[in-house]
Amino acid sequence: GDEIKIEVTFEKHLENKILKALFKSHAYEEVAYEIYELQNQHQNIGLGMIGELKNPMSEKEFLLFTKEKMECGGIRHSNFTGKEIKKVAVLGGAGSFAIKNAIQAGADAYLTADLKYHQFYEAENKLLLADIGHFESERYTKNYIVEYLRKKILNFAVILSEENSNPVKYL
């Protein structure tokens, strides 16, 4: 019969699932396949940011500073590593998928939101992992978006909402 060639681009973490599906659908034939890994040519483009503090802080000082500046009702965090905080990774919103990226980048701390219980173990002795709250982690983003739009679209009125839409309350 005729051979069919199918090409697919997928994220690395899906490789096993895709191969299982491929083998399952070709159970009676030997499957010819090749995998080419694509390397990101633009390492500075993506979600989140990483930077360094001018003055390193203890982990407790850093969390208290973050709580004040981000106006958090509370911060859930991993065990202290005993290291000073200098290099910080930040990803607004639900950022659990990037814990490994923050570790690989050599961050001392990773600020994000919506972490689940077991995800705090991923940081163990590697970095300080802090869940500062979804709304809190994104609260200032709108200011930067408005500033950017006002510079780029001069003939358009950009109005910043003052509405606080955080459904999460703290006691």
Where are these regions (language model features)?
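Hydrophobic structural segments
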Residues: 1-171
